[in-house]
């Protein structure tokens, strides 16, 4: 277990405890595996659990107000010095990731063939991300760093290495790898409400893209038909891309 501190956060959120543990079982060294030792060089099962903290993306003054006199404002034709206002978030804290990993290491024929298989499950909470905010709230950047929600990452990683030829003068080795990760947003701002402005949707990956379904290019005849159709609230013109009207009400929204 370890304690980490960061001066980027306020005093009450500065320190975080991040425990971890790991164990392994070298199965190939057990007595009941003695008959396999002429071809099985290594077989090890391992498991680990750990909590890690992240403060990347947080600036040294994101929890403290700054005054900057380099901003100028026009008041009735008179230019005056002013203070650029940056929104702060004094409640920022560590982003935490709890990870559980199970892995298998193996080696065959004096490790001429060897590899690893890893399964992992990560749950990240208090994600530190830039959240879009209306300019009228006082942020000239339109964004503020916040602890916004929870995300799950789970997947598999496979690595296979082979020593195909080994001579006094040269070796021929090959490596193969495969990885698959599934990223899912579980919670945002303590609830199940999507943050559309950030492209964050519950049950979907971070920064998933939603868009209209296009049905091809509008022809001259189709454009005339759209123009003459009183039920068609959204008009398409010649050369434009036609958008699929999912609910059939004549309006794209």
Residue ranges and their predicted role:
Residues 70-87, 201-253:
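Flexible glycine-rich, low-complexity coil/linker segments exposed to the extracellular/periplasmic environment
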Residues 1-213:
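Extracellular/periplasmic, surface-exposed regions of secreted and cell-surface proteins
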